[in-house]
Amino acid sequence: VRIHPFRALRPIPERAAALSVPPYDVVTTEEARALAQGVPDSFFWVTRPDIAFPEGEAAPPERQHETARQALDRLIRQGSLVREEVPVYFLYRLIRKGRPQRGVVACFETADYGTLIRRHEKTRPDKEEDRQRHVAALRTHDEPVFLLCRDRSDFTAFCDQQEQAIPLYDFTAPDGVRHTLWPVREPDRLAPILERIPCAYIADGHH
C-alpha cells in the first residue's frame, strides 16, 4: 500500500481538545448543536454546518458547504489551525476502556482503491456525492478515512520507540477516549514499514 506523509492542517496543542469532535455521522443535528454550544472552536462548525442554521431550517446543501468553508477559514485565520511546514506522518494512539489502538495519520493513493485498498461494505451514492461536494467546498479533507491492516511486529516496535517522546497532543475526550498523537519527524524510518503492508481494508469514513 502506498502511504505518504503530508502537510497537515492541524490544531495548535492548546486548542486540540476543544476542536476534537466525534465523526459527523454518529450524532444528530441536535446533539452536535448542543456539543458545539459555547465552543466556537468546535470542529462541528466545519463537519456539521447544519448546526449554524436556525432549528428547523433545512438549508440547501450548497449553503451548508459554504458555511463549513467559512468556519474552517475562521479557525485558520484566528490561528487555531496551523499548516505543517514539511510533510509529516503522525503516530496516533487512542485508548478506549483500557484497550489501546495504534495507527498512522497519513495520505494514501486513491489509485490503490479496489486492489490494495479494499472496501468491506456497499455505500450509498447520495452520501458519497454529498461528501464529495463537502470536501470540494472546503478544499480540505476534514475527516479521515479509517483503514485497517493486520498487526505487524515491526510497526509495534516502531511505535514503542516513538511513544517515549513527548506527544504533540494528549487529552481525554468527553466520551472517555484518550487521544495521543506524535509527529514522526523522520519519515524515512517509517516509510519502509508502511511499504510492507500488503493490503488494507476501509473500516469507516467512506460514507
Where are these regions (language model features)?
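A cross-family signal for N-terminal binding/gating loops and helix N-caps
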Residues: 1-207
